[in-house]
């Protein structure tokens, strides 16, 4: 335990919180260009082919972003928007692709949770 005199001479330092999404640089989203679109397999005990892409961001970072939803139209050189949010069973994937923004289309025939997948309200 520090004495009062020690604390007067050198106050306690506040630990700076480390960001989970450093490539966003405190922005809500960032734009980038797909450099590679591929599938990868999740950690045990899950099994699937998860759709992901490598993205070169406008600030120079190169990150891996998850493409949510069923089916996508992304390929190399597609311009996309990414947001934060990791994928628990894919190590190293800390960003999500925003569906329905820039070159990334919304999910076809989506009826529920449409706002998360960039789908307009269907005509009644």
Curated annotation (Swiss-Prot):
Keywords: Methylation, Ribonucleoprotein, Ribosomal protein, RNA-binding, rRNA-binding, tRNA-binding
Amino-acid biosynthesis among keywords: no
Swiss-Prot/TrEMBL GO biological process terms: translation
Pfam families: Ribosom_S12_S23
KW tRNA-binding (keyword) present: yes
The protein's assembly and partners: Part of the 30S ribosomal subunit. Contacts proteins S8 and S17. May interact with IF1 in the 30S initiation complex.
Known role: With S4 and S5 plays an important role in translational accuracy. Interacts with and stabilizes bases of the 16S rRNA that are involved in tRNA selection in the A site and with the mRNA backbone. Located at the interface of the 30S and 50S subunits, it traverses the body of the 30S subunit contacting proteins on the other side and probably holding the rRNA structure together. The combined cluster of proteins S8, S12 and S17 appears to hold together the shoulder and platform of the 30S subunit.
Family note: Belongs to the universal ribosomal protein uS12 family.
Protein name, as recorded: Small ribosomal subunit protein uS12
Lineage: Bacteria, Pseudomonadati, Pseudomonadota, Gammaproteobacteria, Enterobacterales
GN (gene name): rpsL
């Amino acid at each position: 335990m520090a004495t009062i005199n020690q604390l007067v001479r050198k106050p306690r330092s506040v630990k700076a919180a480390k960001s989970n999404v450093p490539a966003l640089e405190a922005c809500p989203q960032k734009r980038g260009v797909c450099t590679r679109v591929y599938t990868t397999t999740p950690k045990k005990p899950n099994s699937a082919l998860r759709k992901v892409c490598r993205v070169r961001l406008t600030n120079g970072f190169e990150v891996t972003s998850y493409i949510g939803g069923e089916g996508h139209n992304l390929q190399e050189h597609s311009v996309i928007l990414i947001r934060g949010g990791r994928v628990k069973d894919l190590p190293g994937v800390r960003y999500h692709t925003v569906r329905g923004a820039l070159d990334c289309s919304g999910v076809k025939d989506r009826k529920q949770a449409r706002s998360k997948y960039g789908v307009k309200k269907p005509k009644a």
